[in-house]
Amino acid sequence: MMQQEQTFTIINKLGLHARAAAKFVTTAAEFQSDILVRRDGREVNGKSIMGVMMLAAAKGTEITVRADGNDADAALSAIGRLIDDYFGEGQ
């Protein structure tokens, strides 16, 4: 089993609001690895929309994503691409 961790900065204008959180959870759910997201000492399940929304990660917020499992690398890469793409919102 592999464990990977990476810190990302939320760059889209609206932060991790409902639609972005839904895309995050949908992406995380594509992988078998457990996905945990941490912000300011609070850690939530990255496959739980309520958990991800509770982080209230606004633009400029740093989140740390940890993936535990055989596809941990791929999971973090996919989540990183989603964040870098502004969650598909264009800004």
Language model: regions and residue ranges:
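C-terminal structural segments of small proteins and small subunits
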Residues: 58-91
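Compact, glycine-rich, soluble single-domain proteins
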Residues: 9-50, 54-59
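Generic detection of intrinsically disordered/low-complexity segments and helix-coil linkers/edges
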Residues: 2, 18, 25, 80-81
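Intrinsic-disorder/low-complexity, polar/charged segments enriched in Ser/Thr/Lys/Arg/Asp/Glu/Gln
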Residues: 3-7, 62-64
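SAM-dependent methyltransferases
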Residues: 1-2, 91
